[in-house]
């Protein structure tokens, strides 16, 4: 078990790719905190992991709220004693051309996909430092690298922002053993 003794927090972990990530991490021995706005699905994923012999905790999380992140990371550390891994998985998509994109549409995608990982990373770093280091995994997309008419400008911009957030954070916190 490659992750035995480690504690992972996965945003958007209630269903889909995030739930799969949570189960994989648990299968490798990590205790897993599942943060999501989808409480019923999150509790179901938590139960599946716990019933299969893993350790999981569901915590409510609105990735666009700094206080929600602080509460979720705090609950994780209170339950498991540390934080070693953060997976910023929560995300939303959008389609359409820029001239038909409302400011609210733009803000929603940017808040979840870019601000969310920023706030999660900010909340996780102090706890990772206490643990002697950690790993931050930000889920992006190939659409963060290339433009296409098949997606939306706000989605592609948000995924490009995640890539540079990841690179900058890794460089700034490498001396702390956080990558």
What function would you assign to each model-found segment?
Residues 39-40, 61-71, 103:
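The beta1-alpha1 cofactor-binding region of Rossmann-like NAD(H)/NADP(H)-dependent oxidoreductases
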Residues 141:
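Residue(s) in the substrate-gating loop at a strand-loop-helix junction
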Residues 126, 171-175:
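Alpha-helical segment proximal to the catalytic Tyr-Lys
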Residues 121, 158, 166:
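Active-site helix of classical SDR
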Residues 3-33:
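Canonical Rossmann dinucleotide-binding motif of NAD(H)/NADP(H)-dependent dehydrogenases/reductases
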Residues 97-98, 105-107:
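Substrate-binding pocket helix/loop in short-chain dehydrogenase/reductase
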Residues 101, 147-156, 168, 178:
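Active-site loop-to-helix junction immediately N-terminal to the catalytic Tyr of the SDR YXXXK motif
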């Amino acid at each position: 078990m490659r992750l035995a003794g480690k504690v992972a927090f996965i945003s958007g972990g209630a269903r889909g790719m995030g739930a799969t990530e949570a189960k994989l991490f648990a299968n490798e021995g990590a205790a897993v905190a599942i943060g999501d706005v989808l409480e019923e699905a999150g509790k179901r994923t938590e139960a599946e992991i716990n019933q299969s012999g893993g350790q999981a905790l569901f915590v409510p999380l609105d990735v666009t709220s700094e206080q929600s992140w602080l509460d979720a990371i705090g609950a994780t550390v209170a339950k498991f004693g540390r934080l070693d891994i953060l997976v910023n998985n929560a995300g939303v998509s959008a389609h359409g051309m820029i001239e038909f994109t409302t400011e609210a549409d733009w803000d929603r995608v940017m808040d979840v996909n870019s601000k969310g990982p920023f706030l999660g990373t900010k909340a996780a770093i102090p706890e990772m430092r206490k643990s002697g280091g950690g790993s931050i995994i930000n889920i992006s997309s190939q659409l963060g690298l290339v433009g296409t008419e098949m997606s939306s400008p706000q989605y592609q911009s948000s995924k490009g922002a995640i890539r540079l957030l990841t690179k900058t954070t890794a460089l700034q916190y490498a001396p702390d053993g956080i990558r």
